[in-house]
Amino acid sequence: MTRTPTTSTGHRARPGSRREDIAAAAIELFLDRGVAATRMEDILAAAGVSVGSFYHHFRNKLSLAATVYLEHLQRFQRDLLVELDRHARTEDAVRGLVLAYLRWAGADPRAMRYLALCREPNVAEISEGEEARLKQSFYGRLAGWLDERAATGELRALPHEHSCALWLGPAEQLVRAAIDPSGYSATPDPDTLGAHLAHAERVLADAAWEALRRPALGDDADQAP
């Protein structure tokens, strides 16, 4: 039975540590070639580590691919929840999460590309249990927050999946289009991705707030809850 990698924070990689070097080299290779086509010897050569060093940190190539995915997913979700908790005002939180999503992708396009694009079936299979747990926890936090703000009358009382789609769906779609070379839009250089996404910050934040806020009496907006 295949074990699912976990995102335990018991071992934190230090800047420049061998574990970090292996992970960084592997991501570059996985993004360029795919996990299946990347050879172990290529990872070792790119990271400048020995076989022994590799197996000290990771069980095998698939474990490495899955672990790196889960760690980036956990970091992404954690950073968005930190942003959510920063704001007392509902409008600021709605807007802030959209900005945090776009800025996270712009600051670390390699990690975002890996999260969005590197989901080969054999890697997804061994990480799906932990991935499901992380996503359930993350969206559970968002759902609880949405319920609280709907109860105060500040937000529309929509099904959670509708609210999350209206809130973060446009940012997710824009990011995916920008980092996927097979997408429908021009793919900006990683060095200019942040600026590319920044141009959309206000329009997407405005759209999210307009979609989620409960219209005041007399507004022309849809009055449905």
Which residue stretches match the model-derived regions?
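Amphipathic alpha-helical segments used for helix-helix packing
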Residues: 106-126, 176-184
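Helix-turn-helix
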Residues: 18-21, 29-63, 67
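Hydrophobic alpha-helical connector segments
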Residues: 67, 81-110, 163-167, 201, ...
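Amphipathic alpha-helical packing segments from all-alpha helical-bundle domains
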Residues: 74-77, 125-152, 161-165, 169, ...
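Short coil/turn segments at alpha/beta junctions that flank glycine-rich nucleotide-binding fingerprints
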Residues: 32-36, 87, 108, 152
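Hydrophobic alpha-helical bundle segments that form small-molecule/ligand-binding pockets
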Residues: 82-87, 136-167, 181-188, 212-220
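N-terminal intrinsically disordered/low-complexity leader segments
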Residues: 1-17, 184-187, 191, 216-225
